[in-house]
């Protein structure tokens, strides 16, 4: 299965992808983790992410392509946090097509804004992540709405979208995702 996990910051993408990887054995490429690792040596990237800015499509595509080239994408993967724009989606579909592969599913984790803010504030206190400060949270949610919602619409038109109520408990959300995996991979 080749899938995408989308959702606003705080929707549980990382948590669910961790469960998918550990319980279903599917490789997960988490762009947020990749970016945080690269930020240790790339000051320009660190400045953009720390201020809540949006990393350009060309930079993001290059980073994801590097990751996908290192993974065996033919056996399946889940992308966490990518693509976030229509240009990135087009790039991904072209990348897969050049390898005679297709996208199988897109999971949209959906959560009310007030619950997202509550989750992100709690995460900031626990982890000290600089991208979870209130001012940055508001900007990240704004960027998500502007940039990523067209991805959801495009994937829905292609029949790939599976909306998941991510306001539920972790196990309930995982079961909803697993049910889709079971249906799609039959």
From Swiss-Prot:
GO biological process terms on file: AMP salvage
Residue ranges of region NMP?
30-55
Catalytic reaction equation(s): AMP + ATP = 2 ADP
Instruction: Identify one Pfam family in the record.
Output: ADK
Q: Does the keyword Ligase apply?
A: no
Write out the function statement from the record: Catalyzes the reversible transfer of the terminal phosphate group between ATP and AMP. Plays an important role in cellular energy homeostasis and in adenine nucleotide metabolism.
What is this protein identified as? Adenylate kinase
């Amino acid at each position: 299965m080749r899938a995408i996990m989308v959702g606003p910051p705080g929707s549980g993408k990382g948590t669910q992808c961790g469960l998918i990887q550990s319980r279903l054995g599917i490789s997960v490429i988490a762009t947020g983790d990749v970016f945080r690792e690269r930020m240790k040596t790339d000051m320009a990237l660190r400045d953009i992410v720390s201020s809540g800015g949006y990393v350009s499509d060309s930079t993001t595509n290059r980073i994801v392509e590097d990751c996908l080239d290192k993974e065996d994408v033919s056996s399946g993967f889940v992308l966490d946090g990518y693509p976030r724009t229509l240009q990135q989606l087009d790039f991904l579909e072209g990348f897969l097509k050049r390898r005679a592969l297709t996208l199988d599913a897109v999971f949209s984790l959906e959560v009310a804004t007030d619950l997202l803010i509550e989750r992100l504030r709690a995460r900031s206190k626990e982890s000290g992540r600089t991208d979870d400060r209130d001012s940055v949270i508001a900007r990240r949610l704004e960027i998500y709405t502007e940039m990523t919602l067209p991805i959801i619409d495009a994937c829905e038109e292609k029949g790939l979208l599976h909306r998941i109520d991510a306001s539920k408990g972790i196990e309930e959300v995982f079961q909803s995702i697993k049910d889709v995996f079971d249906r799609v991979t039959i």
